[in-house]
Regions:
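Domain-level signature for soluble enzymes in the chorismate/prephenate branch of the shikimate pathway
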Residues: 1-180
């Protein structure tokens, strides 16, 4: 992340970049940040009037990734599908806390089709929570799919695929100054 008139580079965890750019902009400091599109979209769902904008999308292409890039996915036991779970009966879903808002939005769409979910926020190891029987399904990022397969899970649905994004405050970067 860059801030101020002098060029300063600050390092934060990817999930903290949107809040950091927002906080700096709120303190009247010009800042940009590089993060995942999924994390940026999740932040915007929490803070709709943040004034943050996408300045540039950098396409993520990796042939080692299961879907070519990180994908937020609905995961469940291998050999089953979401349709195998009865509608109208509560299903426990472990949601990675990094993607809580994107996951809730997705699950709300499924609830409109008759599913009932108890949404449980989990700090990491969502796959293990399914394997241990703590939850029926999980929503987490899949990259290579290795940990998912090792846990005996498979992708039931892709919720969101993610690229890199450069973000900033509309106040500093929107329109008049532009972004190179």
């Amino acid at each position: 992340m860059l801030s101020s008139n002098a060029l300063n580079t600050l390092e934060f965890r990817a999930e903290d970049i949107p809040l950091s750019v927002y906080s700096l902009a709120s303190s009247n400091k010009k800042a940009i940040g590089l993060t995942g599109e999924d994390l940026f979209r999740d932040f915007l769902l929490k803070k709709r009037n943040s004034g943050l904008i996408l300045l540039k999308k950098v396409i993520w292409e990796d042939r080692n990734a299961l879907f070519g890039k990180p994908a937020l996915c609905l995961l469940g036991p291998k050999g089953k599908a979401l349709n195998d779970f009865p509608k109208g009966q509560e299903l426990r879903v472990g949601i990675s806390t990094k993607y809580k808002e994107l996951a809730k939005k997705y699950l709300n769409q499924l609830e409109s089709k008759g599913y009932i979910f108890r949404k449980l926020a989990i700090n990491g190891c969502c796959e293990t929570a399914v394997t241990a029987g703590l939850v029926d399904l999980a929503i987490d990022i899949v990259y290579t799919g290795k940990s998912m397969q090792e846990a005996g899970l498979e992708v039931y649905d892709r919720v969101f695929t993610s690229d890199f994004v450069i973000i900033g405050s509309k106040r500093f970067w929107g329109g008049k100054n532009g972004f190179p």
